[in-house]
Every structure is written in structure tokens, then in C-alpha cells.
Swiss-Prot record:
Lineage: superkingdom: Bacteria
Protein name listed in UniProt: Aspartate--tRNA ligase
Function: Catalyzes the attachment of L-aspartate to tRNA(Asp) in a two-step reaction: L-aspartate is first activated by ATP to form Asp-AMP and then transferred to the acceptor end of tRNA(Asp).
NCBIfam families: aspS_bact, PRK00476.1
InterPro entries given in the database record: Aa-tRNA-synt_II, aa-tRNA-synth_II, aa-tRNA-synth_II/BPL/LPL, Asp-tRNA-ligase_1, Asp-tRNA-ligase_1_N, Asp/Asn-tRNA-synth_IIb, AspRS_core, GAD-like_sf
Length: 595
């Protein structure tokens, strides 16, 4: 039906007859002439109808926005005064000789001249996706997956599919469960990741695997999370962690060159401990120059319990955050930032405004200055590198609260005060994460997942001191987003059972949930390591949006609902009966529980 795409016409096509298919983006009726901007997935071209083609001109008078049409005509060069430099096709236009209205459109529920609500965009997603910016995002997503497949094929990786209907295994979030009709009372789980299957593929001898795969997690949603998401999943045998990082870094660097024309350079490597200490985050945005600076040793003897308490507590921390030019912040803004850090558990925000450092105590303004000596203030200013016009904020609490609160404040200040250089790309690897973290109930939970290997520890050493264990894990971070994460996996049965035991999974549960894995580990399992990238997050970065729903064709809301199809929906009672499932209403359930 077409010979060319609208958006691909150029001056090289001048004089050629073309047939185009697409939609009316805009129509301008000048009486004897009618102009339309005609759109398809590749872009927009101007088409005009003149009196010499009376039938086409008459039919064109009926055109309205979003009519689906076919046009045949001749490509002509525009007069120089009419060239539109803002359009890729702005140097040419198409003189229409034939017009077919394929399908008419009713008045649109979306307004192309105004910003539509996200609810409206999601409800009429098929119309929202017609917008050029949305089409461009999905085209870039397609380019990313195409590039990844080429790269992986060139490096000897095999694309192998793993099951969608599998067994529920604890991986940190709730599973989406699928009832079995054949095995009544039993359920499949949709995979949170192909983690165990890709490890089993390594045990099967497929030493380089990849898959671009859908994953599912029934968790509380955030702006950058979806219940179903796509991973670029990778696993290798007989490769060390540095070797895995090297090949995956090469892939991402080449991807950025292909999509953005940018060389990211070598990725710096930072330990988890350093990232938390300097940036209050395990995914630091290195475009932001603000850093956390420890000052507890300077404040142990002050007569100010807010500082002295954490400064003398082994589990406490006092850190300073120097904000260049921050002395200009108003009291109202300072109070707002104080309320902001309370979200992260901080009790407030002490500060020092540096107006004229050379004047010592007379050159600062601070509500806590009365508790500090001139020597302590000078030491703080020296350590933080404070200059005239700077602001120093303080966090004093347990280590986690200080890191979380000042880390979040750092990001907010970077954005609010335009300190973060958004023209740059800042990738890095974060390594050496703690193996376990406190689960809040006196036990331990895996910081990544239960199949991550500890670094340089035997099973006996791990059992004796699990809190000291460092995971052989690594995350790739770009501009403050974790775009990929992975680890060296456990490949010995005794180590895997030790980790399960530390996590409170008894032997019976181990056999019930992971018996197939423990059995597989008995038969010459090779050392293996891998990584998974979030395709959605990569696409967000490469398209310049901060909303994950902008890079997914048909996303869910933050309530895990599809406004277009109205999913989830109630199931047919007969279908539920076949599955052996009965829906219990809340009132009935409450009465049963009260009996």
C-alpha cells in the first residue's frame, strides 16, 4: 500500500512519485489549496492538494485530524522561503494526485494541543502511542534490543528461553501465582527472574547464555517500577567477576555509542562502603559534586547531645554536606529541607551558613554555633572545603538514617540548585556489598538473593561470622540509576545450604523449595557468574525520560492496573470452579474468622 515512509522523504526523492500511508496530523484549508501534515511512525511530511487535481482536493476538504489515509503524489522541493528547518522533511513536500480515506476518526479523547493527564494517556494508550515522542521512545527500545542481540551473538552467547510457569521460590518480593486446573490446589508462579534456570543452564554446559525476558513481581510500586518488566538476562561459566564486568561494560559502552554517539569511557569501580560513606547511596549520581564528609571525631566532646550522642556511638554517624552557594537559601527553604529529611528518619537538619570564612565565628550564621568552639568550626570548614557563600548541613543519627537522609538531600539539592550536571553521563560499578542485612526481626536476609557467593570465605567461615561476609556482587550504575546487577553464584552444595541456614530456611524447607537446585549442585557444577540489566531503565536513560511508563508500550499504573483493558478483572465463576477456587467476600471472611 505504500512505497515510502512519510518521515523518510528527503531531497533525493524530488521528482519521484510516492505512495504514503498514515494519519492526518494537522490540516490547513486555504480555500484553493489544502495542506496537511501527514504522519507515520517515521515522522511527518507536508502534503498539499491543488485545484488541478479537483477530485483529490474535494475529498481533502473532508479530512480531519487522525483520519487514516493513503496519498499518492509527487515529491517537490519547497521554495527556499518555505523551508522548515525544524522538520527532517522540511525541504520537500508532496503534491497529491490521489487520496483515499481508509478510515475516519471520531473526535479524539486526547487533546493534542494540551498536556493530557497520565490517566487519559493510559486509558487511550493506542492514541497516545501515535505521538511522535512516544513512537521515538519505542523505536529506541527496539534498537536497544536489536543491538543487544547482535552483541551477544557476536560474543558467543546463546539465546535460550526459560519457563514462564514455574515454582514459587523466595526472591525478595511476592510472586504472581497461577492456579493449576489439572493439579487442583496447586499453583505455578510467574518468574521474578530466570535466576535458577540460568544457573541450571550453566550446570548443563551452556557456558554463555542470554535472554531478553519478561519478569513479574507483585510488590508495592514506585515511579520506576512495574509489576511486569523486561530484563536483559546474562549468565556465564568459567568467568570471574572482573571478566563479567569487562564484557558487560563493553556492551553498554558500545550501546551508548550506537544510540547516543557518546563514549562513556572506562567505568570507575567503587565499593559499597565507599559509596555509602561519600554519597549516602549504593547507586550514587556522580554528576552531583556534593559529598558527605564524616565529622564525628570533631564533635565527640561538644555539649550538644544531638551531635555528641551519635559521635560517641559505634553505630552512630555525624556527617556534613557542603552545598556550594547554599548560604543564599532562605529560612523557608531550610525548613522545607528539614522536613524533607524527616521522611528518611532524621529528626531535623542542623546547619552552618558561611558568609565570610576569614572572620571565623563572626563569619558564620548557625543555630548550633553556641555549642561549638572556634577551633571546631574551623576544623569543620577546613575538612569540608567550605568557601564564602556555602552552606553546611549536618546529619547526626545512626549510620543508616544519616546515609539515607543526607543521600536523599544531596540529590534534591543537586536538582533544586542546578548543581547536578545533566549534560554528562556518569557510569560506575559498585562492588563488595554486604552479603546479608538485618531483617528487622533479629534475623538476616540476603542483600541480593540467596544464590550469591560470598567473597573469599569458606562455608565454615561464613557460618561463624555471617555479618562480616562480603558478597561477590556488582551493580552497574549510570546517573544514579541501577541499570544492572549481578554476582558470582554459589556453585557448591555445602555453601548453598550454609547460606540457606543463615537465612533461617531449615533443611525441610530447603528440600521442599530448592531440592532440584541442591540435587543439581551434586554433579560437577562449574563456577558461574552473571548479571541482569533492566531494559526499561536503560531505555529511560537513553530516551531522556524519568517515567518508566513512557518506555513501555502498554504499562500498568502504580496500582498495577491497566486502565485501557480494565485489568485485573473478575473471573467467570465457572472458570474459577474448574480451578477449584472460590472467592470469599470480605464480610463472609470476617464472619468466618470471628467464629
Amino acid at each position: 500500500m505504500r512505497t515510502e515512509y512519510c518521515g523518510q522523504l528527503r531531497q533525493s526523492h524530488v521528482g519521484q512519485q510516492v505512495t504514503l500511508c498514515g494519519w492526518v496530523n494537522r490540516r490547513r484549508d486555504l480555500g484553493s489549496l489544502i495542506f496537511i501534515d501527514m504522519r507515520d511512525r517515521e515522522g511527518i511530511v507536508q502534503v498539499f492538494f491543488d485545484p488541478d487535481r479537483a477530485d483529490a482536493l474535494k475529498l481533502a476538504s473532508e479530512l480531519r485530524n487522525e483520519f487514516c489515509i493513503q496519498v499518492t503524489g509527487t515529491v517537490r522541493a519547497r521554495e527556499e522561503k518555505n523551508i522548515n528547518a525544524d522538520m527532517a522533511t522540511g525541504a520537500i513536500e508532496v503534491l497529491a494526485s490521489d487520496l483515499t480515506i481508509i478510515n475516519r476518526s471520531e473526535s479524539l479523547p486526547l487533546d493534542s494541543n494540551h498536556v493530557n493527564t497520565e490517566e487519559a494517556r493510559l486509558k487511550y494508550r493506542y492514541l497516545d502511542l501515535r505521538r511522535p515522542e512516544m513512537a521515538q521512545r519505542l523505536k529506541i527500545r527496539a534498537k536497544i534490543t536489536s543491538f543487544v542481540r547482535r552483541f551477544m551473538d557476536d560474543h558467543g552467547f546463546l539465546d535460550i528461553e526459560t519457563p514462564m510457569l514455574t515454582k514459587a521460590t523466595p526472591e525478595g518480593a511476592r510472586d504472581y501465582l497461577v492456579p493449576s486446573r489439572v493439579h487442583k490446589g496447586k499453583f505455578y508462579a510467574l518468574p521474578q527472574s530466570p535466576q535458577l534456570f540460568k544457573q541450571l543452564l550453566m550446570m548443563s554446559g551452556f557456558d554463555r547464555y542470554y535472554q531478553i525476558v519478561k519478569c513479574f513481581r507483585d510488590e508495592d510500586l514506585r515511579a520506576d517500577r512495574q509489576p511486569e518488566f523486561t530484563q536483559i538476562d546474562v549468565e556465564t561459566s568459567f568467568m570471574t567477576a572482573p571478566q563479567v564486568r569487562e564484557i558487560m561494560e563493553a556492551m553498554v559502552r558500545q550501546l551508548w555509542l550506537e544510540i547516543k554517539g557518546v563514549d562513556l569511557g572506562d567505568f570507575p569501580i567503587m565499593t559499597f562502603a565507599e559509596a555509602e560513606r561519600r554519597y549516602g547511596s549504593d547507586k550514587p549520581d556522580l554528576r552531583n559534586p556534593i559529598e558527605l564528609v564524616d565529622v564525628a571525631d570533631l564533635l565527640k566532646s561538644v555539649e550538644f547531645a544531638v551531635f555528641a550522642g551519635p559521635a560517641n556511638d559505634p553505630k552512630g554517624r555525624v556527617a556534613a554536606l557542603r552545598v556550594p552557594g547554599g548560604a543564599s537559601l532562605t529560612r523557608k527553604l531550610i525548613d522545607e529541607y528539614g522536613n524533607f529529611v524527616k521522611i528518611y528518619g532524621a529528626k531535623g537538619l542542623a546547619y552552618i551558613k558561611v558568609t565570610e570564612r576569614a572572620k571565623g565565628m563572626d563569619g558564620i550564621n548557625s543555630p548550633v554555633a553556641k555549642f561549638l568552639t572556634a577551633e571546631i568550626v574551623e576544623a569543620i570548614l577546613e575538612r569540608t572545603g567550605a568557601q564564602d557563600g556555602d552552606m553546611i548541613f549536618f546529619g547526626a543519627d545512626n549510620k543508616k538514617v544519616v546515609a539515607d537522609a543526607l543521600g536523599a538531600l544531596r540529590l534534591k539539592l543537586g536538582k533544586d540548585l542546578s548543581l547536578t550536571d545533566e549534560s554528562k553521563w556518569a557510569p560506575l560499578w559498585v562492588i563488595d556489598f554486604p552479603m546479608f542485612e538485618d531483617d528487622g526481626e533479629g534475623g538476616l536476609t540476603a542483600m541480593h538473593h540467596p544464590f550469591t557467593s560470598p567473597k573469599d570465605m569458606t562455608a565454615d567461615e561464613l557460618k561463624a561470622a555471617p555479618e562480616e561476609a562480603v558478597a561477590n556482587a556488582y551493580d552497574m550504575v549510570i546517573n544514579g540509576y541501577e541499570v544492572g546487577g549481578g554476582s558470582v553464584r554459589i556453585h557448591r552444595g555445602d555453601m548453598q545450604q550454609t547460606v540457606f541456614g543463615i537465612l533461617g530456611i531449615n533443611e525441610h524447607e530447603q528440600r521442599e523449595k530448592f531440592g532440584f537446585l541442591l540435587d543439581a549442585l551434586k554433579y560437577g557444577t562449574p563456577p558461574h557468574a552473571g548479571l541482569a540489566f533492566g531494559l526499561d531503565r536503560l531505555t529511560m536513560l537513553l530516551t531522556g525520560t524519568d517515567n518508566i511508563r513512557d518506555v513501555i508500550a502498554f504499562p500498568k499504573t502504580t496500582a498495577a492496573a491497566c486502565l485501557m483493558t480494565e485489568a485485573p478483572s473478575f473471573a467467570n465463576p465457572a472458570a474459577l470452579g474448574e480451578l477449584g477456587i472460590q472467592v470469599v467476600e470480605k464480610e463472609a471472611k470476617a464472619s468466618l474468622e470471628n467464629k
